[in-house]
């Protein structure tokens, strides 16, 4: 399911990446220089199945197996911007997928803890990330399992992102709330047939939610 090349060469397909950033991302209002630099530097073709390599920079999500997808480039850039990543932020990612969103967050300086529900995708993501930056998965944590279950481990995060849609808003008793530090941000889609992207910001004993508009993601599994 991953690219057949043994290494990810950032010097290949540079013009395609530049066109993607200009026409799909900047044109839609993304101005964060760090996010734009990340999107320009990461070879997206190394994070899609080899059969879709020629379509890697198209303005749409692509299948990666198990009815999962790699998100549209703009969606990755938008969500990365909304997280307001600061260097050293501990970020919990639900749904490693192909590893592309992880790569963008890593480029922004995040310390990643990422969970993938499908073991073959987990293994492929590690291969993809290692081709991109050898040794990177040894310096961060990528595990196979359930996101909510992993949060019961007692770790705390400045930022959390779900790449799959929750069925309901998490309350203050949820592992999401308990694992997010005060002042932290949780970004997630919610809904079944109709979905919206939500941003939650935690205070000391509560959190606020804001809807950011309609989106379409695969449902969260492993609950």
Tell me the role of every PLM-derived stretch:
Residues 84-208:
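Conserved nucleotide-cofactor-binding alpha/beta core module
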